[in-house]
């Protein structure tokens, strides 16, 4: 599953997001100024 979050939201919740990405193999698309800028995925993916 993939979730899209703004960079400011990722900054505020980074530890929680890393736990979720690692444990549930979720992908997080990070946006900057409303445009996709990066993806956070687990090391195993």
What is the predicted function of each stretch?
Residues 1-21:
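Bateman/CBS regulatory modules and CBS-like beta-alpha motifs in cytosolic regions of diverse proteins
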Residues 20, 27-45:
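Short, charge-rich, low-complexity interaction segments located
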């Amino acid at each position: 599953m993939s979730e899209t979050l703004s960079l400011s939201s990722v900054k505020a919740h980074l530890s929680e997001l890393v736990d979720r990405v690692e444990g549930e193999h979720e992908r997080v698309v990070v946006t900057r100024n409303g445009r996709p800028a990066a993806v956070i995925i687990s090391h195993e993916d």
